[in-house]
Amino acid sequence: MIQPQTHLNVADNSGARELMCIRILGASNRRYAYIGDIVVAVIKQAVPNTNLERSEVIRAVIVRTCKELKRSNGIIIQYDDNAAVVIDQEGNPKGTRIFCAIARELRQLNFTKIVSLAPEVL
C-alpha cells in the first residue's frame, strides 16, 4: 500500500534512485496505490550526470510493494521493499533496463514495454 509521502526505490536505470509519492492517479480521493498503479512522485535522490535531477516531478508505475498481492488462484506475492519504474506521459519507461522481477498483473494492465524489459515475470 503506497500512500502520499511514501518513499520508493527505483527499479530501472533512468537516473533516479529514490522517489517520494505525492499523488495517486485514478480518482480524486484515492488513498492507496498497489502494483500497477500510476503515481506522481518527486525525485529525492538521483545519479549524477543524468537526465533526471533531484526535486523533479515525474510519473511512475508501482512494481513492488511490501503489502501482499493475492491472486484468484490462492498465490500470495510479497516483496521486501516498495519500488517503482519511471515512465513518461505515454506510459513508456524512461530507462532501458529493469533490475527486478515484476508481477504478471502489469501485463494485464498494458505495461508491455515494462514487462518486456524485466528479467523475470512472476
Swiss-Prot record:
Keyword Ribonucleoprotein attached: yes
Protein name per its UniProtKB record: Large ribosomal subunit protein uL14c
Subcellular location: Plastid, Chloroplast
Reported function: Binds to 23S rRNA.
Gene name of the record: rpl14
Pfam families documented for this protein: Ribosomal_L14
This protein's UniProt keywords: Chloroplast, Plastid, Ribonucleoprotein, Ribosomal protein, RNA-binding, rRNA-binding
GO cellular component, one term: chloroplast
PANTHER family the record matches: 50S/60S RIBOSOMAL PROTEIN L14/L23, LARGE RIBOSOMAL SUBUNIT PROTEIN UL14C
Natural source organism: Glycine max
InterPro entries: Ribosomal_uL14, Ribosomal_uL14_bac-type, Ribosomal_uL14_CS, Ribosomal_uL14_sf
GO molecular function: large ribosomal subunit rRNA binding; structural constituent of ribosome
Family statement: Belongs to the universal ribosomal protein uL14 family.
Subunit structure: Part of the 50S ribosomal subunit.
GO BP, sorted A to Z: translation
